[in-house]
Amino acid sequence: MENLSDRFNVLQDQLMNIYESAANTIESQIEHWQTLRKEAVLLYFARQKGVTRLGYQYVPPLAVSESRAKQAIGMMLQLQSLQKSEYAKEPWSLVDTSAETFRSPPENHFKKGPVSVEVIYDNDKDNANAYTMWRYVYYVDDDDQWHKSPSGVNHTGIYFMQGTFRHYYVLFADDASRYSRTGHWEVNVNKETVFAPVTSSTPPDSPGGQADSNTSSTTPATTTDSTSRLSSTRKQSQQTNTKGRRYGRRPSSRTRRTTQTHQRRRSRSKSRSRSRSRSRLRSRSRSRSRSYSRSRSQSSDQPQYRFRSGGQVSLITTATTTTTTATNYSTRGSGRGSSSTSSSTSKRPRRPRGGAIGGSSGRGRRSSSTSPSPSKRSRGKSESVRQRGISPDDVGKSLQSVSTRNTGRLGRLLDEALDPPVILVRGEPNTLKCFRNRAKLKYAGLYKAFSTAWSWVAGDGTERLGRSRMLISFFSFEQRKDFDKTVKYPKGVDRSYGSFDSL
């Protein structure tokens, strides 16, 4: 007990010396977090031994000490990585390297030079909100290289430049949906109006829009531009759908009644056309079933039909065991199909229950023929697959695109089952890279390959959308299942499943 108290007092003295010296060096900040880590570990150990007080200091629960120790370890690793870069010689204070500053937007980034940004909604000074823009943001790229990027503000939000991309860490439209009634706002930086509210459509510089040159960096100039993000479209929809508006049309007006009657007439005509099409389909299916029953007694003239049996491959493959040399359906004006066969087997393919012959239209269809052709050898493998199905061991083994010619619907479904499976993981870039490196050491053999970290880019701009992504490919679905059961994904990482035609 006394030994723990003495060690705890030594750590307290070290922290006091760091606070009093206030050295703005990165070495001093690393020492500060190392001391905090030792303090959290000591308090954790004391709590495990049943000690509730060390002198006048109350010993927190185990979960609190564990969380503080992990936080100190994380900050210490980040600072040690920053120490190896060219920015280690810059002054770093306790505020710059605090956990609160590191976790503030943009999260998990070191930043300096806070600037106050005030956004006034609906041109009402009492309806305002304050944000923080950082002059410089430090981030790590995919190659573990540190970069220093300036931050800026425009009518869309606050961003920092990540290479050639604008990474928005504050979007004014998110709070405008809660605080604004008209969808307009005014942006003020250091009590200077940067963007005044005007009536316009979607701003071209918003994420997914076109780039705009009227943006403000760390020393913004006074300009005027559109300040609504998706404001006009939302406002129009609200005015048309909301009842009792001041300038809205009354529900009992003549135009509203005429539009309602037109809508009712359209819905009635649609329902009548649907009922007529259903009755036609029923009559056609009955006539086809009668012709099919009459043709069962004729063993020489057998057309080859294609059935659909609710997705069960076994029922479909049993109906493809016959070998018809040439079966052709000619389309007549009456909508009936006549078939002519040169040779056929004595065994008749059985029709599965619940199947439908041909398509839903009244025209005849050409069935798949197995007559000899120059591509018979290349189709030999697909024909055998359609006859016997796919074994579980072959699922996910194909690495080539599926051909759409001479395979039919069933053959394409069976060939697509051979596509290699993948897992798409989403998270922070550093987290995904650490997960990839850990998987190479611990889970080798449970996957085929990892991709690099990548991101989606807006169609009309250069902004990155969402979090970073990474693909994991496998040889089979069983391997992916084993990987999913064995591997423990990092916290904050989401995953989804899929497959590709080729890799």
Swiss-Prot record:
Residues 419-503 are annotated as: DNA-binding domain. Phosphorylated. InterPro entries: E2/EBNA1_C_sf, Nucleotide-bd_a/b_plait_sf, Papillomavirus_E2_C, PPV_E2_N, Reg_prot_E2, Regulatory_protein_E2_N, Regulatory_protein_E2_N_1, Regulatory_protein_E2_N_2. One of its GO terms (biological process) is DNA-templated transcription. It is found in: Host nucleus. One of its GO terms (cellular component) is host cell nucleus. One of its GO terms (molecular function) is nucleotide binding. Disulfide bonds: none annotated. Residues 243-293 have a biased composition (Basic residues). Gene3D superfamilies: 3.30.70.330, E2 (early) protein, N terminal domain, subdomain 1, Papillomavirus E2 early protein domain. SUPFAM superfamilies: E2 regulatory, transactivation domain (SSF51332), Viral DNA-binding domain (SSF54957). Residues 1-201 are annotated as: Transactivation domain. Keywords: Activator, DNA replication, DNA-binding, Early protein, Host nucleus, Phosphoprotein, Repressor, Transcription, Transcription regulation. Residues 213-234, 317-346 have a biased composition (Low complexity). Residues 196-404 are annotated as: Disordered. Belongs to the papillomaviridae E2 protein family. Binds DNA as homodimer. Interacts with protein E1; this interaction greatly increases E1 DNA-binding activity. Interacts with protein L1; this interaction enhances E2-dependent replication and transcription activation. Interacts with protein L2; this interaction inhibits E2 transcriptional activity but not DNA replication function E2. Interacts with protein E7; this interaction inhibits E7 oncogenic activity. Interacts with host TAF1; this interaction modulates E2-dependent transcriptional regulation. Interacts with host BRD4; this interaction mediates E2 transcriptional activation function. Plays a role in the initiation of viral DNA replication. A dimer of E2 interacts with a dimer of E1 in order to improve specificity of E1 DNA binding activity. Once the complex recognizes and binds DNA at specific sites, the E2 dimer is removed from DNA. E2 also regulates viral transcription through binding to the E2RE response element (5'-ACCNNNNNNGGT-3') present in multiple copies in the regulatory regions of the viral genome. Activates or represses transcription depending on E2RE's position with regards to proximal promoter elements including the TATA-box. This is Regulatory protein E2. It comes from Human papillomavirus 21.
